[in-house]
Amino acid sequence: MSHLAERMSLIKPSPTIAITDAANKLKGEGKKICVLAAGEPDCDTPDHIKDAAIQAINEGKTKYTAVDGTRELKEAIIKKLERDNELKYEPNQICVGSGAKQVLFNLFMATINPGDEVIIPAPYWVSYIDMVNLFSGVPIVVECKQNFKLTPELLKSKITKKTKWLVINSPNNPTGAMYTHNELRDISKVLLEHSHVNIVTDDIYEHIIYDEKFFTIAQVEPKLYDRVFIVNGVSKAYAMTGWRIGYVAGKSDIVKAISTLQSQSTSNPNSIAQAAATEALNGDHGFLKERTETFKNRRDFMVEKLNSAPGLSVSVPQGAFYLFVSCEGVLGKKTKNGKVINNDLDFTEYLLADHLVAVVPGVAFGMENFIRISYAASHEQLEIGCNSIIKACQECLTS
């Protein structure tokens, strides 16, 4: 008899684990792996943020805080939402958690009943599907082939009486696609016709954008304000992935329920990390411009290099630090060892085993025959990785 709960059968390890395990095995054998799979900035947390954490430690701010976050951090979040997104919230509409992932998990736990449908545009961040499944919801995956974005027509075709949530992730992981003001306005028109559908916006890459301005949907259509729940955090913008601070902003009764769940699980987020996050949101943002310029230069370099690889096709992302690369041109080809590349998983395994480059298969994000490549790495590593990928493509197309 298994001691595991039946609900564990509803979730599965990410396909990325196999790549990670294989990369670690090769590293253990002394091989140098070019890892282009990172989901976090490669820069350090800015000094003024670290200094705020050190000061909090020295001042003895090491006790429990309010379950839903310190007053100072909630005020900083409220200021940020008004400053950056032109949205006004009260403290009882904010809950701080141990990362954006936790507050999203709690939001779904607090609201999804068995059979409730959640519309998830694909490609999607890997955790959305399993979170919905864990609470006996029904993920309604919408494959978005037009610039990797949900269209009003696609959305309208998927809404039913059972639809509870629409998930919008912009800029998107894994594609870097970002919705424009007009695109969000058009999606809003559909949502205004279906008052039972709530919207969660995963805005975690908000400050890593390039050629367009960022908008969140409640900013574009104020009539949706009470139905929109913004999930965000300090991980990506401020290079604070390990600090584990995220937050949700939305209707107070749902936010209260999220806080209640948190009170019976993790309790408050780390007190020192909250002090650091407060400084991140309130402090100097000058470094963001320089950091974004660095990412943009890397993006442009990678797009040009990889578009020269036979069999690959790369579109230009508008945000985040990923390329979502079509590998359809190498499918059906053979490696030097005679193995046929049937899909994106085969291709990523080939890149790692034969060319020592670690990337993530698109199937992990709900869209086959693509690979996700992170450019959150040094220029030297990116050049090594690109050259290795180009060589890999040339080899399998001539074998």
Regions found by a protein language model. Give the residues of each.
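PLP-dependent class I/II
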Residues: 2-4, 12-14, 19-22, 26-32, ...
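Substrate/cofactor-recognition hotspot
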Residues: 8
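A glycine-/small-polar-enriched, mobile loop at the entrance of the PLP active site in fold-type I
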Residues: 37-40, 55-73
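Conserved N-terminal alpha-helix of the aminotransferase class I/II PLP-enzyme fold
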Residues: 64-97
